[in-house]
Regions:
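Bacterial Sec-dependent N-terminal signal peptides
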Residues: 1-25
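Glycan-recognition and catalytic cores of secretory/periplasmic carbohydrate-active enzymes
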Residues: 21-218
């Protein structure tokens, strides 16, 4: 009986080990494929086709790499570019990623930060003129997320100070004191919008990004 039990346990252990090996092998394969896709396809596309000669990034790029030069440029897109190349540099150490991260940080702070009312502009023209000055919690969180990542990647104090400043603005203007949580959208000077773009005063999506941004900033 003891021998049968031992053989059974040995069989189970061998099966677990085999599954672990296969799992680790699959994980390694998937990881390698993802890294290759990011470094060989995703990041190069944006590096080759999205960088505008004026120092910013095109608001729209077609699938074949053709930029729509007169397309408006969004705060969320540019915050994502900032986060992406900052995270890429922090992960891979490639100096070309650092160059784009720093370029993105400068453009974002100079173009999308509302120096008067606080917060992040939603849309600007290619020449930097504000097209839509509405404030969205969604855009605020991506800005904090991107700037915090840039600080982690470079140690740039301006990025950290700007991220912390946006955090305080969002807590002061965007947080709903009576029921808690964060209101979705506001006017340029932080009055609540009566007509919400998504017909909701608060959304799960915005709150997920608040959690994401605040966690990284912390």
């Amino acid at each position: 009986m003891a021998r049968k039990t031992f053989c059974f346990l040995l069989f189970i252990c061998m099966g677990v080990c085999a599954c672990t090996v296969r799992h680790n092998s699959l994980r390694s394969t998937l990881c390698a494929e993802i890294v290759a896709n990011v470094r060989d396809s995703v990041l190069p596309f944006w590096m080759d086709y999205a960088v505008a000669p004026d120092g910013g990034f095109y608001g729209t790029v077609l699938r074949n790499g053709t930029p729509v030069v007169d397309a408006p440029r969004g705060g969320v897109l540019n915050a994502r570019i900032l986060w992406s190349f900052s995270a890429a540099y922090r992960t891979f150490g490639d100096e070309s990623y650092l160059k784009l991260a720093n370029k993105s940080q400068r453009y974002f702070i100079d173009t999308f930060i509302d120096k008067k009312n606080g917060g992040v502009y939603w849309l600007v023209n290619p020449d930097g003129e504000v097209v839509n000055a509405s404030k969205y919690t969604y855009a605020m969180t991506y800005a904090i997320y991107g700037l915090a990542e840039h600080y982690l990647a470079t140690g740039n104090d301006e990025s950290l100070k700007t991220a912390i400043s946006l955090y305080h603005v969002l807590e002061e203007k965007g947080r709903e004191p009576q029921y808690d949580g964060y209101v979705e959208s506001f006017t340029e000077n932080w009055e609540k919008l009566e007509q919400y773009d998504n017909n909701a005063p608060k959304t799960m999506n915005a709150h997920l990004h608040v959690l994401e941004a605040y966690t990284l900033l912390y």
